[in-house]
Amino acid sequence: MSDNIVVGIDIAKLKFDVAVWSGKNHYKTKHFSNDLQGFDAFTDWLKPDSNCHFCMEATGTYGYPLALYLSDKGWIISVVNPVQIHAFGKAESLRHKTDKIDAKLIARYCASHHPPVWQPAPHCECQLLALVRHLNKLKEMLLTEENRLSVADEIVCDSHTKIITLLKQEINDTEQKIKKHIDDFPMLKKNKALLESIPGIGERLSTTLLAYIGDGSRFHHSGQVVAYAGLNPKLHESGQLKGRAHLSKQGSAELRKALYMPALAAINCNKVVKKQWEQLTARYKGDRAIASKIH
């Protein structure tokens, strides 16, 4: 078989659709269950086409097990920002959207753009990310319950109070698990200490950065980290329309949220950062776009 065979994968919670494309308008399509049995059936089905380049969208927990499975088997796999696939689809003026059509679109994107090969993060970093995400969800649930309690009828207040107590205990337990997990792995412990040596970065932010960025080796310059968080300014101008710069928000919303308040704190506490902020204020409007540059 030729080297230009690509496989587009459209991931859903319970299944995934695939499209094997070898050029022109010829596709081989099929769908499989999104579990280990489906992964094995998928690779068995592909055996005649064993030199493929796989491509899927970065869909978080739904797609990660399959991406890891393919990587462990030695296949070439790329994991692409969904925004890039969406823009590619708009350029093709697609009229319909189905899982099969999306898989074909991803295959064509892979063939034309040759995205970089995806490398899985170390298992200890994946576990840390899972813990940090779980902690964030628990905190969101706690805030929701506290808001409900503030307006609840007296007859259900006791139930809300019990749930709040349980959530606080789970939050505390998860925070302790995170600390122990970092202490158990010298690499994580060392990188966390390096992050906290930077003025303005405390334990909470260092843990979040460690979970989402790792040791930073997959980023070649700071601009890539900013883009990964979706904090890069995006300017829209057309003809005589002079648009304002806005955050692209084409990245990790969780990381963006974690960085925003420390950036504002740095503006108030760090003279160098404050001077940079004042210079940017004279050039741009919009505190969020300016704060992104402070990072």
Could you describe each region identified by the protein language model?
Residues 2-21, 106:
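Gly/Thr-rich phosphate-binding beta-strand-loop-beta motif of the actin/hexokinase/Hsp70
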Residues 51-59, 106, 263:
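Acidic beta-strand-to-loop metal/phosphate-binding motif
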Residues 71:
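Anion (oxyanion) recognition and catalysis
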Residues 75-194, 198:
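Long, charge-rich intrinsically disordered scaffolds of nucleic-acid metabolism proteins
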Residues 203, 208-291:
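Phosphate-backbone recognition surface of nucleic-acid-processing proteins
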